[in-house]
Amino acid sequence: LKFSPTGPSFRLRNWIGRLMRRNHRKVLIIDEEIVFLGGVNVKAKFRAWDDMYLKLTGNLARPLLRGFAKSYISSGGNRRNVRRFLGRGLEKFIPIWRDKLKFIIHSPNSASLPRGQRVFSTALAMAKETFNLLTPYYVPDRKFLKAVRLARKRGVKVNIFLPRRTDVRLAELIARAYYDITTRAGADIYFLPDMHHGKAMTVDKNLGMVGSMNLTPRSFSHQEESGVSFTDSEMVDELNALFNDLRQRA
């Protein structure tokens, strides 16, 4: 077992950014063929939390090996140990899935920042009937709230699922400041009785997403995140069924 904390080097000129930045991805890769990806942390106290993750098997797991290799190197690992994972060839997985499944590998220091920041607003703009969102920490920006208002004008039912209480008191207080403006924009907020750490989204019956991204500025600007979006109808239906279960519990 080898362990290296993220960001081993230190530079005075960007010490604040390094202080805020962290690797928030939650990805488990087993034998290069099985991947668990979502919001699950590894710590004893988190066992009591509800969470959500996606399991991928076979060639579908290969594109994430490249992201792991980059994190391994940036954490101080020897590049030679993961060189074979850095080739683009790993991303050429089963052709039939290429248009049905896309990985979201977000880094605050890369061009993926706008993409990561627009994930939720762009998805909401696509909705025609229903938009479901699960996030434990909720600090929406103006673009997201505007997207909620426009969606309601189109007749879209916007459902946002949040835990009634979280493990971060400050984050909970900040989220409460947005409840009223969010409902006035047209969304329905469902409060879950237990701590739910999952991060997921569905757009109608057409699109689903599971990952580690919270709807907060910190998640977009300072954290490395991972997720997977999918359009496979069975996968989206299953995720919508989970949202229906959450609605019954709220």
Tell where the protein language model's regions lie, with residue ranges:
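Charged, low-complexity intrinsically disordered terminal segments
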Residues: L1-A250
